[in-house]
Amino acid sequence: MLLILVFLLPVGPMRRNVEKSVGDMLKTGDEIPEDAFSKYLWKNRETYTDAIMVQNAIERLPDKNAYEHAMWMYHYDLEEDVWTPEDSLKAFCESHENVNDMYLHIYARYWHGYLLYLKPLLLLFSWKHVVWLELAVQIALMIWVLITAIRKQNAGVAAVTLGSFLFMKPVLVLISLTMSVCWILTLLAVEYMLLHHDRLHEKGQYPEFFLIIGILTSYFDFLTYP
């Protein structure tokens, strides 16, 4: 039901906002700066999946309604058998009214819950600004976890949580639409446990708590199978 509602949002402004920054977000070859950090960043970024997520957010077939879009998740690609999401998104942005040279696919095996926030955000901001906004949210959540852990005299939790982050390609997680979803959910879960550990432990609610976290991860994370 929620996906149907977001598919009722106008895609015109979303497409224009994506077009503003698609060149900056999908650099290749000579477009990548020569410094070592930029080369590392662009070589390891999850642009393949991010491009699919963004294009899913701005797709709209004139002969399909919101329910059909939410159910089947239509997606145009330049290739019929091998997906080329970065090039396909660029081509789609250049001429989204003319898709005669593209192949229509369906991507129905995932929940695509990320569209609940990605579509409204792209309605208001460019793709680049959405990434910066997610970066700010992640930094704010990490600071919140650190402060709460110190106040609860449980600094070890903060140390372990933030320490583990260093082993997860931290820079890439912070600027990736794909990777940031699980990290944000993890930080929210840790924060909730810090605030409500006694109640969760005394009432034996941890199994249900982790079940809810798993459900949310499966729903919002693009790469988690239902």
Where on the chain are the PLM-derived regions?
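Hydrophobic, membrane-inserted alpha-helices
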Residues: 115-118, 139-144, 161-169, 210-217
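Interfacial juxtamembrane loops and adjacent helix segments
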Residues: 30-106
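Membrane-interfacial loop-to-transmembrane alpha-helix junctions, especially the N-terminal start
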Residues: 150-160, 199-211
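Membrane-interface micro-motifs in multi-pass membrane enzymes
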Residues: 111-112, 164-198, 202-206, 223-225
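Start-transfer (signal-anchor) and selected internal transmembrane alpha helices
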Residues: 1-13
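Membrane-interface alpha helices of multi-pass inner-membrane proteins
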Residues: 206-226
